[in-house]
A protein has these predicted regions:
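N-terminal catalytic cores of NTP/NDP-binding nucleotidyl/phosphoryl-transfer enzymes
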Residues: 55-89, 300
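A structural-propensity feature for long, helix-poor, extended segments
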Residues: 107, 111, 119-120, 333-366
C-alpha cells in the first residue's frame, strides 16, 4: 500500500498547515544546554550553534543510520527536506543520528564511483551500536580509501570523530553545517541523560506500548495494509546493552534479555548509572524523540512512513501529538558524461532509475535508423487485424473474443521480437553497450537507485557546485541535479 494512501486511510497528520499547528511544543528543559555542549565538543560551525535559537519555535526532525561519509545520498536529501521545512516556519532542523542501531551491515560499507569503477570499502565492524564503535581502528583504512579527498578540510574534520556515529555527525556538520543542520546523537554523553524520565516511565508499564503497536497493526491489516511492526507476547519496546544489545521481555513482574533476569529496580539502577544502556526499539524511538525534542514535523522515507504509521496508539499513550509527517525528497545526480548520454537519447533519468535497461531500449529505438519504421509497420498490422476483427464480428458475433485474443498474442509477440531486435543490435554496437553500462554504474549501481548507494559527499567533493544544486532543489517529490 502506498504511503499516501495509508496516510489518508489512517488520518495521519500531514502537510505544512499541520506543521504550523504543531509549533510551540516544549522540549526537554535541558535540551538547549545539552545540545550546545555536544555541538561545542564537536567544534560545530557557528551557523549550527546559532540555529539552536529555532528550538523555541519548534523542530523539524529527520534521521538515518550512521553510515560512512554520511551514508547514501538519501541522508542529505532527508536533511534538505527538513532544512527547507524548518526555514519556512522559523524552526530548527535536527538530524537524529541513529547511534543506538546495532545493524552494522547497514553502515559498514562505503561505495564510491572512482574513474568509472564502483569501489567498495567494507569495514569489519563489531555487532555493537554505532555509538559504541570506536572509529580509531578504522580511521586509517577510511583515509586510505578516500585518497586525496581525505585531505579536504571537511573530510579531515569528520575523520577526527571518536566513534562511528561521531564520524557521521561530523560529516553532516562539515557539509551541511553552514545551512544550520543540527545533528542529535542520543548516545552522546551530553544527550543520553535527557531520555532518563521517558525510560523510567516505559519501565512502569513495559508492555503497554507493544500492545498499542499490535492494536494499530491489526487496524492497518484490516484496511489492506501490511504493517512492518509486530511485537511477540511479552516483548517490550526496550533494548538492554550488556555484551550485546538485546530486546527485553517482561513476564511475571520481571524482565529478561534471554540471558538473565532483571528486576525493575535493577534496570532503574542501570539507567541511573548509564542511561545510554537502555534504548528504545523502532516502535518507541520516534515517540522518545518527540518527548525530548519540540518536534513539529518529521521527515521520513517510504519504508519509515509505514512503521511510523503504526505508532498512533503509542503517541496517545504518552499524551503527545504525532508530528506532521513528510516524505523526503528523492533525487538523482547527473554528472557531465551521464548528462550528455541522457540528452543524446532524450532519456528521462528517472525512467532509467525506475525501468533500467528497458527504459534505455525504449529511448534507443527512437534514435535508431530503421527501427521506428519497423515499429510503425507492426502498428499498421495490428490496426488491420482490428479491422478484420470488426468485419468478422459483423458476420459472426461469437468470433469477437477469439479475434481479440489473436490480436493480443500478435501484439505481445511483436513487442518481444522488437525487443530482441534491439538487444541484438545493442550487442553488436559497442557505443550503445558502453552507454548502457555507464548509465547503470551512475544511476543504478549494484542494481539499486543511486541515492541508496553513493554518498552525496562524493559529489560534493568532486563538484564544488553540488551542495548549491541541492540547496536549489525542491524539498519534496523528485529532483534531477545536473552537475558540471
Amino acid at each position: 500500500m502506498e504511503a499516501q494512501v495509508l496516510a489518508q486511510l489512517l488520518g495521519l497528520p500531514q502537510g505544512e498547515q499541520v506543521l504550523k499547528e504543531r509549533l510551540g511544543r516544549e522540549g526537554h528543559p535541558q535540551l538547549s544546554s545539552a545540545l550546545a555542549a555536544y555541538l561545542k565538543r564537536l567544534q560545530a560551525p557557528r551557523e549550527v550553534l546559532a540555529a539552536l535559537e529555532g528550538l523555541g519555535q519548534g523542530a523539524v526532525v529527520t534521521g538515518q543510520q550512521a553510515g560512512l561519509l554520511g551514508g547514501p545520498a538519501l541522508t542529505f536529501y532527508k536533511a534538505h527536506t527538513a532544512l527547507g521545512l524548518a526555514e519556512k516556519v522559523g524552526a530548527a532542523s535536527l538530524f537524529w543520528v541513529a547511534s543506538q542501531d546495532h545493524d552494522v551491515e547497514e553502515v559498514r560499507h562505503l561505495h564510491l564511483l572512482l574513474e568509472e569503477e564502483v569501489c567498495t570499502l567494507s569495514l569489519p565492524l563489531p555487532p555493537l551500536p554505532a555509538g559504541r564503535i570506536p572509529f580509531a581502528p578504522y580511521r586509517e583504512a577510511v583515509r586510505e580509501f578516500l585518497g586525496s579527498w581525505s585531505r579536504d578540510t571537511r573530510v579531515a574534520y569528520a575523520l577526527e570523530g571518536e566513534t562511528l556515529s561521531e564520524f557521521f555527525a561530523r560529516t553532516l556538520l562539515a557539509f551541511l553545517g553552514e545551512r544550520g543542520l543540527i545533528p542529535f546523537d542520543p548516545m552522546a554523553q551530553e544527550l543520553a541523560p535527557l531520555f532518563q524520565k521517558a525510560l523510567e516511565r516505559e519501565l512502569e508499564d513495559p508492555l503497554a506500548s507493544a500492545q498499542a503497536i499490535n492494536q494499530e497493526a491489526e487496524r492497518i491489516r484490516a484496511l489492506g495494509g501490511r504493517p512492518p511492526l509486530k511485537r511477540k507476547p511479552g516483548a517490550t519496546n526496550l533494548f538492554l546493552e550488556t555484551d550485546q544489545r538485546r530486546l527485553l521481555f517482561y513476564q511475571d513482574g520481571a524482565f529478561t534479555d534471554g540471558v538473565r533476569r532483571y528486576s525493575k529496580k535493577e534496570l532503574l539502577e542501570i539507567l541511573r548509572t548509564d542511561p545510554s544502556r537502555l534504548t528504545p526499539a523502532a516502535g518507541l524511538r520516534p515517540v522518545f524523540q518527540d518527548l525530548v525534542l519540540p518536534t513539529a514535523g518529521f521527515v521520513v522515507g517510504p519504508n519509515e512512513f509505514r512503521y511510523v504509521a503504526e505508532l498512533s496508539g503509542v503517541y496517545a499513550l504518552y499524551g503527545i501529538p504525532m508530528p506532521a509527517l513528510f516524505l523526503r525528497l528523492r533525487a538523482v545526480v547527473l554528472e557531465p558524461p551521464i548528462h550528455r548520454i541522457v540528452e543524446r537519447y532524450r532519456l528521462d533519468p528517472w525512467a532509467f532509475v525506475d525501468g533500467g535497461e528497458d527504459a534505455f531500449l525504449k529511448a534507443v529505438k527512437e534514435v535508431l535508423e530503421g527501427f521506428r519504421e519497423l515499429e510503425a509497420e507492426l502498428l499498421r498490422l495490428l490496426e488491420e487485424v482490428e479491422a478484420l476483427g470488426q468485419k468478422a464480428h459483423a458476420l459472426e458475433p461469437t468470433l469477437e473474443r477469439p479475434f481479440r485474443r489473436f490480436r493480443a498474442r500478435l501484439k505481445g509477440e511483436g513487442e518481444r521480437l522488437l525487443k530482441k531486435l534491439l538487444r541484438a543490435r545493442m550487442g553488436r554496437d559497442a557505443v550503445l553497450l558502453h552507454h548502457l553500462e555507464r548509465l547503470k554504474r551512475h544511476l543504478l549501481p549494484r542494481g539499486l537507485p543511486q541515492e541508496r548507494v553513493y554518498p552525496f559527499a562524493m559529489y560534493a567533493l568532486r563538484h564544488p557546485e553540488a551542495l548549491l544544486r541541492l540547496r536549489e532543489a525542491p524539498i519534496s517529490g523528485r529532483a534531477t541535479l545536473v552537475l558540471g
